[in-house]
């Protein structure tokens, strides 16, 4: 099976049930019983802890439910207005190179943002995608402010990927204040709407679909 099956889930998907369904799909892909898949969805407000999460980075543990995700990375927030893309691809077929896979995810996000004339950038030592904010006050050292617009955290099981990425369309950015996102204190978070772009979830989904084959060819 080579065609990637796309699903756009309506409403807010409960985290635990979605994680269980994702694990079942990964097992089916590994067994050759199901096609690779990408699920586009939103979660209710919650925090997830990756395998590198530090307790001190959970600033407000009572604010929202906290889930141990099992993916790489640290703490992140999911909630309404944020598009989560769960990416279940067979790297045994596509190439057993985890770093290349994460780079391809970043490139996919960067290409998607470019569809809206947003320049997303990667930073050494900071997984995810960032935007420079010349409209905001510079840092204490005079460097321009940079805000995170997309987070990436993945896990592999027998070379099938799961978890994936999240892109901020129009979430409540104050909800990120309950954590230190991805363990990075010196930078903020932003969204497409925060950047002044009236982008809808449907607009973003269409851009994700258009740009995907450039970075993950069959």
Curated annotation (Swiss-Prot):
Q: Which GO terms describe its molecular function?
A: lipoyl(octanoyl) transferase activity
- Assigned EC number: 2.3.1.181
- Organism's domain of life? Bacteria
Asked whether the UniProt record includes Lyase among its keywords, one would answer: no
Q: What protein family does this chain belong to?
A: Belongs to the LipB family.
Q: PANTHER family, per this entry?
A: LIPOYLTRANSFERASE 2, MITOCHONDRIAL-RELATED, OCTANOYLTRANSFERASE
This protein's name: Octanoyltransferase
Organism listed in the record: Cereibacter sphaeroides (strain ATCC 17023 / DSM 158 / JCM 6121 / CCUG 31486 / LMG 2827 / NBRC 12203 / NCIMB 8253 / ATH 2.4.1.) (Rhodobacter sphaeroides)
